[in-house]
């Protein structure tokens, strides 16, 4: 399988504090990778490095490279708006904009200068179907997205990312604020998307990681301890630290 994203000796500092320590990892083109580890281990910080969301935080220094389709995204010539279209992100708390479901989904397309109504209509239907929420909202596309339940809002946020046709979808604990039924629906959505997208998800939920991911990476104290096929990580990890975390000895 080909590689779509690679980090090389990636480190991040908040002031003088080193939060990520020389991370080297490859991500396959298509499929789901789960990033696991205890709170404060660096997994969410790492995730935000992958589409330069940490640029928005003051006093952050990043060294090393993140290569996306062979291009270092930290090169001065990188268009970060285009980058975040190609590598989209879904956050922990559902964050629909305070306007209609329809306008939420096409927000990125409008920013990109798309105004053709047929194209926008088609993108809305396709994206909402991919996010497994079309049947629930197709008759009220012009209702305010904030009127939806938390789980529905999160699927609209996924549809908003999908509408601009990204290559990679990043999810930062995208189900942790949801009830179990809504979480399961998001999981099923991700499983349906894994054939067409590279999905990288941060999760504290060990069962979720084992259910949905193809590969799992374990972070601890800013270091990547181990990355492997998910079955291997959960059934026969190589590193003692991984085994201790998986078996609940800390975290």
Swiss-Prot record:
ATP binds at residues 37-44. Gene3D superfamilies: P-loop containing nucleotide triphosphate hydrolases. One of its GO terms (cellular component) is plasma membrane. Pfam families: ABC_tran (PF00005). It is found in: Cell membrane. Its EC number is 7.3.2.1. The complex is composed of two ATP-binding proteins (PstB), two transmembrane proteins (PstC and PstA) and a solute-binding protein (PstS). GO terms for biological process: phosphate ion transmembrane transport. The lineage of its organism: Bacteria, Bacillati, Bacillota, Bacilli, Lactobacillales. It comes from Lactiplantibacillus plantarum (strain ATCC BAA-793 / NCIMB 8826 / WCFS1) (Lactobacillus plantarum). Part of the ABC transporter complex PstSACB involved in phosphate import. Responsible for energy coupling to the transport system. One of its GO terms (molecular function) is ATP binding. InterPro entries: AAA+_ATPase, ABC_transporter-like_ATP-bd, ABC_transporter-like_CS, P-loop_NTPase, PstB-like. NCBIfam families: 3a0107s01c2. It comes from the Bacteria. Belongs to the ABC transporter superfamily. Phosphate importer (TC 3.A.1.7) family. This is Phosphate import ATP-binding protein PstB 2. Keywords: ATP-binding, Cell membrane, Membrane, Nucleotide-binding, Phosphate transport, Translocase, Transport.
